[in-house]
Amino acid sequence: MSDKLNALLERLKAHQRTLILAMAEHDGLPAGSALRQVAELENVIAAVEPVAAEETERAGRVG
């Protein structure tokens, strides 16, 4: 399960990075919806990281 969680983290971070880089291409402030997407991704990343770490630790104890 830790492999799947780590893969999810990588996908989330990659998507967030893509959004940020796209926002940087435009002059002025990004749209509020784009900012919300980045913030929501940050919240999900912050929630998944400890679960992934816990699963990795658990797998290390079992295996």
Task: Please state what every model-predicted region is.
Residues 1-13:
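Short, charge/polar-rich alpha-helical segments
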Residues 15-18:
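A short, structured beta-strand/loop element
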Residues 20-25, 29-63:
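Short, charge-rich amphipathic interface segments used for partner binding and complex assembly
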